[in-house]
Structures are given as C-alpha cells and as structure tokens.
Amino acid sequence: TSENGVDAAHFIYVHTAQSIPEGEFHYEGAMRRAYYESKAPDMDEHGNIDTTGTKWRDNQLETSSCGPGQTWQKFMGLFDTLMQGTVTPIDANRVHLRFAFIQPKDQHETQQVMATALMEEITRQVQQDIPIWENKIYQPDPVLCDGDGPIAKHRKWFSQFYAE
C-alpha cells in the first residue's frame, strides 16, 4: 500500500483520474511528506459550484507518513477533510487497513456532501487497489520509467523498516 502515494500514474490507469497529480516529496528519517496542488471549480457562499469554467479555487493536499504504519492526508480548499490511515500487519500476507475521517462542523452543506463523496471515492479506490496488492510481487530491480514517479527513492526510504 505504501507505494500508492508515489505511483502517480496509477491514478489514471487504475482509478480513472483525469490527470496525474504532481507533488513534492520529502523524506527525513522515519517521516515522508508530500504536498500537492490542484484547481477545482469555485463554490460561492451559498454552496453553488461554478459551472462557467471561469472561477477556480486552489486545492491542496498535504500527506505525512510516519514509517509504514501511519498516514495523514489533509485535503484543503473547496472543502476540508483530515484522513488518518493505519496499516497493521496481521500475518505474512495480510494487513488491516483502517481510515478515520475528520471534517469541520461549520462546513456548508454542499461542502459536507463533497467531503462525504471524497470518503466514498477513497473507499472505491482502495477496493480497486486490493486485487493489485494481492498479486504484487517484489522485484529488487524493477524496470521503471519517468512516469512511474519517485518509486525508487520511496523504496530506498521504506527499506529502513525491513528487518535484516
């Protein structure tokens, strides 16, 4: 599951995203951080989404990982959501993956609907990823291309968590 955040191309080919998200990745000790920016149609104070294609709002996604077991994703912009994910090994071939979502109470009703849709979309995408994870085979020297993102750098960082 760890490579999903750096495998940007899979968002198009597995999850049918409209574009590949581009982000900045930073690794320091046990921490991995990433920052993404995007644009979305703006919303007025009544919760109406602009459909003219002329008004846009900046959105940000900040992610942090503490080792392989804890992640935080903070979605900011059109609506705000904080998602915490935990990955707990169950045995050699299985993990428990859990998410908790937190949203401000004072969001407009439309923002609440969009935040709920985000939770449902993340659940849908995880379900799409599961068959890939179940059939993934570790390759020590995988063939990677430019569009694969910083997978090699991520694997090097992640290797510190493997037992010798």
Question: Locations of the language-model features?
Answer:
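C-terminal catalytic domain of Rieske-type non-heme iron oxygenases
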Residues: T1-E164
